[in-house]
């Protein structure tokens, strides 16, 4: 099969927009290292309105920087693509497209006036940028965009995001009117998001959101806030196989990788197009990453990258809502109060997608209130890492310390009697 080359505009025909309405180029971010111009061209050429594709690479290493630009024949064509593709699944992967209006050619976000943003928490796992945006835009015409923050290694939602408004008055109305209303299957928790500083380059990211959780000292324990990425974690033996032939079975996938070492687990999710392979040893997984990259399995050349081991958060084998409840540390059938503390939205930080970076509470001289602990004596702060596996017993104990008086009988998710003894009951 002949190599596909991305379309290129005629020399000297580059379009230099003077206003936002003239912009016809989209920024695309959160790209995996294997994504190149050919792949993006295959994704967007079906629009029939594509002019050029460019993936930005490091000038020294030549490696992709994780973002690029896609030019269309007109502003209207670019806008249609933005509305159609943003937040949808990228072919052959479990990731979603992250699109926004591009700059005037330097990687800077388009300056379209004042930026008034809100924080939106407790989002359901199926909420995309587009769904979040439209939830607000049907009520407020000045909505400029929305961003659901995702785990960069899995592409899955972290359960919160931001919505931008051009008008401060509409931002304030939305905070009052939309708080507690449903987006998808969950009520939203809304508050203002104050920019820490202007982030001009859209490819800047803050990949870890750290925020305080107040828990009783009786069940509090030191938490290591840093979680090594899979490629740096010597205990990780799992790889992700993208662009997988839809007809390949789990048994065939296991057979293809067993030549490199003992395979102890294989999973192809119901949506297919990708899969996971877990080896018994780390060296076998490393060899698979090196040797199987670009190899043909079935009828397609696969793309290999590191993944998290089964059982680690962010690694979900199927779209089971109960698994998502566990991922966020919620007791099955219970809401966000299972954390035992109200998360302060201002502590989230996110710098990608052209959104400003927001301050984390605790910076400078700010104090963190313990009021969310319900006045529990000895309550203390603990950094919560959304990438770490949650301690469900601890979270449930914190919940009981505040809400036990309102619960009849013993909660089904309270697995042992140790929680009662820990709380001195």
Curated annotation (Swiss-Prot):
Alphabetical GO biological process terms: cellular response to heat; mRNA splicing, via spliceosome
Domain of life: Eukaryota
SUPFAM superfamilies: RNA-binding domain, RBD
Locations listed in the record: Nucleus; Cytoplasmic granule
The keyword RNA-binding is assigned to this record: yes
One MF term in the entry's GO annotations: mRNA binding
Residues in RRM domain copies: 24-102, 116-195, 237-309
PROSITE patterns referenced in this protein's UniProt entry, alphabetically: RRM
Entry keyword set: mRNA processing, Nucleus, Repeat, RNA-binding
Gene3D superfamilies noted in UniProt: 3.30.70.330
Short name of any one Pfam family annotated for the protein: RRM_1
Main location: nucleus
Cellular compartments per GO CC: cytoplasmic stress granule; nucleus; U1 snRNP
Quaternary state and interactors: Interacts with the poly(A) tail of mRNA in nucleus.
Its job: Heterogeneous nuclear ribonucleoprotein (hnRNP)-protein binding the poly(A) tail of mRNA and probably involved in some steps of pre-mRNA maturation.
Similarity remark: Belongs to the polyadenylate-binding RBP47 family.
Protein's name according to its UniProt entry: Polyadenylate-binding protein RBP47B'
Gene source species: Arabidopsis thaliana (Mouse-ear cress)
């Amino acid at each position: 099969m002949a190599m596909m080359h991305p379309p290129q505009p005629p020399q000297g025909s580059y379009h230099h927009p003077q206003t936002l309405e003239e912009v016809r180029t989209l920024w695309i971010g959160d790209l995996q290292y294997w994504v190149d111009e050919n792949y993006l061209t295959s994704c967007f050429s079906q629009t029939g309105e594509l002019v050029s594709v460019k993936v930005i690479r490091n000038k020294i290493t030549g490696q992709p920087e994780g973002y690029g630009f896609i030019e269309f024949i007109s502003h209207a064509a670019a806008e249609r693509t933005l509305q159609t593709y943003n937040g949808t699944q990228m072919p052959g992967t479990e990731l979603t497209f992250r699109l926004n209006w591009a700059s005037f050619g330097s990687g800077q976000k388009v300056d379209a006036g004042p930026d008034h943003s809100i924080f939106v928490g407790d989002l359901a796992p199926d909420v995309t940028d587009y769904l979040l945006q439209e939830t607000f835009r049907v009520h407020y015409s000045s909505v400029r965009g929305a961003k659901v923050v995702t785990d960069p290694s899995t592409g899955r939602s972290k359960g919160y995001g931001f919505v931008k408004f051009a008008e401060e008055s509409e931002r304030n109305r939305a905070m009052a009117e939309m708080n507690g209303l449903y987006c998808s299957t969950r009520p939203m928790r809304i508050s203002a998001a104050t920019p820490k500083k202007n982030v001009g380059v859209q490819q800047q990211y803050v990949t870890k959101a750290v925020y305080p959780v107040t828990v009783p000292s009786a069940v509090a324990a030191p938490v290591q806030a840093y979680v090594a990425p899979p490629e740096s974690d010597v205990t990780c033996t799992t790889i992700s196989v993208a662009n997988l032939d839809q007809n390949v079975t789990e048994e065939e996938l296991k057979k293809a990788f067993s030549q490199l070492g003992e395979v102890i687990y294989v999973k192809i999710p119901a949506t297919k197009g990708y899969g996971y392979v877990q080896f018994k040893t780390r060296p076998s997984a490393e060899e698979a990453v090196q040797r199987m990259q670009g190899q043909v399995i079935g009828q397609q050349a696969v793309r290999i990258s590191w993944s998290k081991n089964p059982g680690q958060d962010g690694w979900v084998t199927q779209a089971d809502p109960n698994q998502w409840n566990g991922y966020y540390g919620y007791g099955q059938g219970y809401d966000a109060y299972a954390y035992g503390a109200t998360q302060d939205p201002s502590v989230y930080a996110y710098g990608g997608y052209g959104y400003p970076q927001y301050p984390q509470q605790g910076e400078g001289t700010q104090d963190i209130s313990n009021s969310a602990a319900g006045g529990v004596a000895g309550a203390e702060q603990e950094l919560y890492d959304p990438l770490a596996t949650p301690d469900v017993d601890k979270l449930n104990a914190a919940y009981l310390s505040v809400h036990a008086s309102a619960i009849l009988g013993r909660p089904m998710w309270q697995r042992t009697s140790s929680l009662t003894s820990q709380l001195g009951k």
